[in-house]
């Protein structure tokens, strides 16, 4: 395949045109008065969004050289989105500002490698300043503010705050379609897994077709139970206590199942048999989770624990166990809290190490079940287009809120990046030559987000910046929605520190790469075949 090449100045200018195409489409969405972008879809209704990464991902330019620049900006947006779940528009605006200023200086003769070094030093100082300004989330109100700003809706902010309050820091919150036009939160307390009773004869509430036992013993094993003999000793011990017994096993069949059903029907022993959740290694891990949560052990031949040798102390306990046809919920497990915390920490470590998205999701789900619950935000809307857009905003706001819990919050509205200039200015004064130019590029770029927010809201950015910097309070800023100067923390205009930090780091990373680019290589497009169709022969 033949290639086309461009070098030095010509190459950088082509990249810049590509960067501008994406950034100009994305930056109009920034701030409380940002506009929407309508994206055509090859099938289904068009998407209406103000999410930077969604817009960037859809842009593909005809000119192959310019398209390389567009792809680099997409990388900024998606990297920021992956790490922090928000801040994609801010990252794009910063990248565009750094690239514009950088290309100007490199064209004037600055050494790109030294410029890159200066950029890196300035960004490191900026990141440190962001960390200093940040403060921990102190209330549900703070969480609601972070979510409201990300989703651009107070109603969504309140829903996310409610969900987070219920499931805690390690809990799982999922987003699903609602069957009505209402948007609300559903909460499942305790550990829930999608396996139900082996036989409907175990049902205690025929109306709801479910089994409900209070204060039951829980026998956990990874074996298939078909013979009743190994179970007899422990069944007798449980029967003497008068408490119910929940058996979680790989499967229960044959003689074992018949005996358990007969005991239940006669009233000798209230019991229910449930299939173990998951498959393979995942099943073993989930059984171990249930054992730790309920304070029991897993009876497994692998570790030499036989069913015949089990005592009441080896069985798990819980306040309530509910079993339906396809789901089981264990509420109020009697496990040791320290052991549960250790298990959660272990799963957290696994999440950090894994690279597979699917693996990450299943581990987070397990962690949430141990931590005490799952919340589902059911999203409702009048049309499919509105539903897609609303769902997307909620998912974004969730990611931003988690980022805020992790690294704290900073004043929003571009104020934190503006304040970080003070630290960057020190670096500019310490450096000289082309490194100084690199640091100066970052210094100038840090005003781009607040400028754009002001512009989108119809204000003059220069006047706002001057007025904000007159006040030394790092939380003092400009509310673009109401057109007032205020304390950003008190007004609830806040961003997660992680989002602001990631936006700056990713923008600088791509800008540095682009400035040090000296050649572009792309594939030559195939010539279109314009030859006329041959005439059909006459017969």
From Swiss-Prot:
ATP binds at residues 29-32, 86-90, 413, 479-481, 495. InterPro entries: Chaperonin_Cpn60_CS (IPR018370), Cpn60/GroEL (IPR001844), Cpn60/GroEL/TCP-1 (IPR002423), GroEL-like_apical_dom_sf (IPR027409), GROEL-like_equatorial_sf (IPR027413), TCP-1-like_intermed_sf (IPR027410). Keywords: ATP-binding, Chaperone, Cytoplasm, Isomerase, Nucleotide-binding. Gene3D superfamilies: GroEL, GroEL-like equatorial domain, TCP-1-like chaperonin intermediate domain. Its EC number is 5.6.1.7. One of its GO terms (biological process) is protein refolding. GO terms for molecular function: ATP binding; ATP-dependent protein folding chaperone; isomerase activity; unfolded protein binding. Together with its co-chaperonin GroES, plays an essential role in assisting protein folding. The GroEL-GroES system forms a nano-cage that allows encapsulation of the non-native substrate proteins and provides a physical environment optimized to promote and accelerate protein folding. Belongs to the chaperonin (HSP60) family. Forms a cylinder of 14 subunits composed of two heptameric rings stacked back-to-back. Interacts with the co-chaperonin GroES. NCBIfam families: GroEL (TIGR02348), PRK00013.1 (NF000592), PRK12849.1 (NF009487), PRK12850.1 (NF009488), PRK12851.1 (NF009489). This is Chaperonin GroEL.
